[in-house]
């Protein structure tokens, strides 16, 4: 449940319908976190409802069905493991500031970091 303010007394403004979606924490108030989603909507969530596991969405801003390649190595010349549709959800294994290693269903590989929502440009995750 995402609320209007940092309290259980505040109105619920929306409910996430899909588990594991990435959010950006933009503020804190006691045990509440103000989060923003990939569409720019924000609200307050109780801290225990959030996970420390990093996930990303593949180019959710794309209006056309332009797939993003999942490469076998950190190189555009590497073989393509899969073609990822916009808004596919993936688990982050690591990021080096330019590439992220992802796990998506039965696939794993590398995606250019600027094609992902849920990690910052240049962010390094080990």
Protein language model features and the residues they cover:
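Boundary regions of SH3-family modules and the immediately adjacent low-complexity/disordered segments
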Residues: 1, 7-8, 15, 22-24, ...
């Amino acid at each position: 449940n995402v609320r209007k303010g940092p309290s259980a007394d505040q109105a619920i403004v929306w409910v996430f319908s899909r588990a594991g979606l990435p959010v950006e924490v933009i503020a804190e108030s006691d045990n509440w976190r103000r989060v923003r989603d990939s569409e720019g909507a924000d609200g307050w969530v109780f801290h225990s409802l959030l996970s420390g596991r990093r996930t990303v969405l593949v180019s959710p801003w794309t209006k056309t069905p332009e797939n993003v390649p999942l490469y076998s190595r950190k190189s555009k010349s590497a073989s393509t493991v899969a073609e990822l549709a916009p808004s596919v959800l993936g688990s982050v294994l690591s990021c080096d500031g330019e590439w992220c290693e992802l796990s998506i269903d039965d696939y794993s590989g590398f995606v250019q970091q600027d094609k992902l929502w849920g990690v910052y440009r240049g962010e390094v995750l080990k």
